[in-house]
Amino acid sequence: YNVFPLMGNHEENLLHIAVQNPYGLELLLKPRNSLSLLNKKGYVKSRFFKFIRNLPYYYQLEDSYLVHAGFNMNIEKSFTDFHAMAWIRNFSIDKKLNGRKVLFGHTPTKISKIKLQIEANSKFICLDNGCSHTYLGKDYGHLICYDLDSKMLYRQKNID
């Protein structure tokens, strides 16, 4: 399988804290059981830092875009607004997309709605089921994987 890792708001936050306030890293990572990202001195291990720092904000495929949050279609150069790609919540179809679908996350969405978007061959497919949002009910709390070739949706219930 080809996997497309993306820069998102959590990655941006981690990089920001790593550079601006490395002493805050433990506070950020401990509740997430992610202290293994840190070296003995409490800094992000260089291999992880380099990997995260070099993540792209989006991928342009033949028939779709993959992005963490979405695109700011209210500006001329939508594909240069990296803040929006990591943080935006609402965006719309625009001719700048050249008919491509947008597959994104960042906004927890009911599994039933995600399935409907896929079945309807929607131009927007949100692949965020709020893996850590199990408190929202049984329609949330899954890690989602979408196979671009087979159009199959896979999900794993949060077991933490």
List PLM regions with ranges.
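Active-site neighborhood of divalent metal-dependent phosphoester bond hydrolases
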Residues: 1-62, 89-92
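Active-site flanking residues adjacent to catalytic metal/cofactor-binding acidic residues
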Residues: 7-8, 67, 105, 127
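Conserved beta-sheet core of the metallophosphoesterase superfamily
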Residues: 81-156
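A short, surface-exposed interaction/processing loop segment used at functional sites
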Residues: 158-160
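Catalytic metal-binding/acid-base residues of hydrolase active sites
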Residues: 9-11, 70-72, 108-109, 130-132
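His/acidic metal-ligating clusters that form di-metal
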Residues: 41-112
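Short, function-defining helix-loop hinge/capping sites that tune catalysis or transport
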Residues: 16-19, 76, 114, 136
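The start of beta-strands in P-loop NTPase/AAA+ ATPase cores
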Residues: 3-4, 63, 101, 123
